[in-house]
């Protein structure tokens, strides 16, 4: 029993010393975190899970310190790496570049309506004292009737009537009458603010806006009953 206890004690002491000292090849072991390691260089994958392995997302020929200027496409993970074509452009950058490519977005220069090429000498040579002969002439002054040019059309100038037709028998009345206009009732309609008088909410006088016009109209017709 004594020999067994002594052996166990020596074994525990040796393990404690080994934990205190640590592994002897720490600085030369592959994959260590020190810069003296020859297996992996201190780069982006360090301090990440499974950092001692090669990343699958990186292309196989991605080597910054490589002296080869031409990439080997057979070893690349993606076909895009190592090609001589221009770099990819993001969608936002492509849309912002439309200002320089799209002609519709370019600022347009404003040009005058009349210049040396488009100016007709007949406009300046026309005598303003001559009477106008039609709608095709440029009026130098405003006509006496402002609405006369609105009724002058190509159809009325080219297709003139053969006969002089008499005016209509019943001419249109120019006066505007409010006799037959229905007013808001003071008794049957609901109370509202659109009323005449001092008290606009309770106006029961029976006098409306067209009462005077109705009295004049029905007085000529000799109607004894004058409606309100």
UniProtKB/Swiss-Prot annotation:
Magnesium keyword on record: no
Region of interest: Disordered: 123-147
Positions of the UniProt region annotated as Mn: 152-162
Keyword Transmembrane: yes
Predominant location category: cytoplasm
Membrane topology, from the record: Single-pass membrane protein
Pfam families, alphabetized: CFAP95
Extracellular side: 1-122
Compartments reported by the entry: Cytoplasm, Cytoskeleton, Cilium axoneme; Cytoplasm, Cytoskeleton, Flagellum axoneme; Cell membrane; Cytoplasm
Quaternary structure and interacting proteins, as annotated: Microtubule inner protein component of sperm flagellar doublet microtubules. Interacts with MYH9. Interacts with MYH10.
Function, as annotated: Microtubule inner protein (MIP) part of the dynein-decorated doublet microtubules (DMTs) in cilia axoneme, which is required for motile cilia beating.
Protein name (database record): Cilia- and flagella-associated protein 95
Organism taxonomic ancestry: Eukaryota, Metazoa, Chordata, Craniata, Vertebrata
Gene of this entry: Cfap95
